[in-house]
Swiss-Prot record:
Source organism of this protein record: Leptodactylus fallax
UniProt-listed Pfam families: Antimicrobial15
Compartment(s) where it occurs, according to its Swiss-Prot or TrEMBL record: Secreted
Residues where Leucine amide is found: 25
Biological classification of the source: Eukaryota, Metazoa, Chordata, Craniata, Vertebrata
The name this protein goes by in its record: Ocellatin-F1
Entry keywords, A to Z: Amidation, Amphibian defense peptide, Antibiotic, Antimicrobial, Antiviral protein, Fungicide, Secreted
Length: 25
């Protein structure tokens, strides 16, 4: 459903942001 899609997108975005932060450290 739409909620599942939004949850998946949120996880992907969070993963990308986490990767960027880890790369800066």
């Amino acid at each position: 459903g739409v909620v599942d899609i939004l949850k998946g997108a949120a996880k992907d975005i969070a993963g990308h942001l986490a990767s960027k932060v880890m790369n800066k450290l």
